[in-house]
A protein has these predicted regions:
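Beta-rich, blade/repeat-based domains predominating
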Residues: 57, 81-91, 130-143, 175-196, ...
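Loop/turn-rich, solvent-exposed surfaces of beta-rich toroidal or solenoidal domains
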Residues: 293-325, 333, 337-345, 352-354
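A short beta-strand motif characteristic of beta-propeller blades
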Residues: 74-79, 122-127, 176-182, 232-238, ...
């Protein structure tokens, strides 16, 4: 499959300008934020961030205090960002990076300063992704990367010292198509993940049934002209035609990776070692042919895997992970609200929270540590069009 580099612009002049202008630029671009509560975190409390679609009443990104002992959420603040459908906090929790998912020139990556104690946001700046519909975003602390679904690309943004984003230094464009003429008419990048060892980046291409592999340059940052990503060997791993790779996750021990395929509704298990994937199993998560499988996560103890399905029989498929070989056994299915696009498990493993986009609610489920099964505790968090949940301990 042909792959081309659209641009490679190193932006020292832009960086200098950002340093000179500093907060004045940020204050000009900052949008309204509402402060609801000012208390800091206490024992068992997590800071929870929620990204939304803003076509309705939602304003953008919301912060909550979530108690992982009793499953209760308290609202803190919000910031107006358009269509922040995916977001990621920095490792220290001081910054949040979020996409603005649009199929036009509004497609962007946004940088925000975040006050963890108060739960408040301050927009630093936004940079165009150069690819439409950015739907996934990650950071290694030096760079931010977006997956641009309709743009058939991934974009790399160096991070300035103040946490803001410089213009894209690399935009990697992908070509090709798949057997599903309606959904795989071209490349569709849906997810990017850094491997547990921090050495590689994998990019899921729903349109071509591939996982692209890149070697990460840990030295690449604003101080040099080194590329963050270099094509790996092999350049990509191919999965069964028509699968539609969507999201990838890794086992806590780093030895296995699991891929949820949107179109086939299957989960593929891989052995992972030294940057290489070896397929070992394919198992159904969606048994009704909905072509809407979405998200995938593993419990903190590494014993259970969960995968969400949309469009028909909306819910979460539950699998036990064999401790010796990483193979999956399906053990249950939990029906949820409508369109469970995203979900997350608390760090202590007690709760699983589901962002049900079309039910306008985040559902809270208690997780049985022995069976992996879920029980709705009826502590719904009402919010318009929730599509991404992240925790900051």
């Amino acid at each position: 499959m042909k792959k081309t580099f659209l641009s490679k612009t190193f932006i020292f002049n832009s960086f200098a300008a950002v340093c000179i202008l500093g907060i004045s630029i940020s204050s000009c671009t900052s949008k309204k934020k509402t402060h609801m509560e000012t208390t800091g975190t206490t024992e068992n409390e997590l800071t929870m961030l929620v990204g939304t679609y803003t076509s309705g009443t939602s304003k953008g990104i919301y912060s909550f205090r979530f108690n992982e002992k009793d499953g209760i959420a308290v609202p803190l603040s919000e910031v107006e960002i358009e269509n922040p459908s995916y977001l990621v906090p920095s490792a220290d929790g001081k910054f949040v990076y979020a996409v603005s998912e649009f199929n036009d020139e509004r497609a962007a990556a946004n940088a925000l300063a975040f006050d963890k104690e108060k739960g408040t946001f301050q927009l630093l700046n936004s940079q165009k992704t150069g690819g439409e519909d950015p739907c996934y975003i990650i950071t290694n602390g030096k760079n931010v990367v977006t997956a641009n679904y309709s743009g058939s690309s991934i974009s790399v943004f160096p991070i300035a010292k103040d946490g803001s984003l410089l213009p894209a230094s690399d935009i990697l464009k992908f070509e090709g198509s798949g057997v599903d003429k309606e959904r795989q008419e071209k490349s569709h990048l849906h997810c990017i993940r850094i491997t547990p060892d921090g050495k590689y980046l994998f990019a899921d291409n729903l349109g071509t049934d591939q996982i692209h592999k890149y070697v990460i340059n840990p030295n690449a940052d604003i101080t040099n002209q080194e590329s963050f990503l270099k094509e790996g060997q092999p350049a990509a791993y191919k999965v069964k035609a028509g699968s539609g790779p969507r999201h990838l996750t890794f086992a806590p021990n780093g030895n296995y990776a699991y891929l949820i395929n949107e179109l086939s509704g299957t989960v593929i298990a891989f052995e992972y070692k030294d940057g290489n994937l070896k397929e070992i199993q394919t198992i159904a998560a969606d048994t009704v042919g909905a072509k809407g499988s979405a998200d995938i996560h593993i419990s903190p103890d590494g014993k259970f895997l969960y995968a969400s399905n949309r469009l028909k029989a909306d819910g979460i498929a539950i699998f036990r992970i064999h401790p010796d070989n990483g193979m999956l056994t399906k053990t249950g299915y939990q029906l949820t609200g409508i369109h469970p696009r995203n979900f997350i498990i608390t760090p202590n493993g007690k709760y699983l929270l589901v962002a049900c986009r079309d039910s306008n609610v985040i559902q809270v489920y208690e997780r049985d540590a022995d069976t992996g099964l879920l029980t709705d505790v009826h502590r719904d968090i009402k919010i318009d069009k929730p599509v991404c949940i992240r925790f900051i301990p």
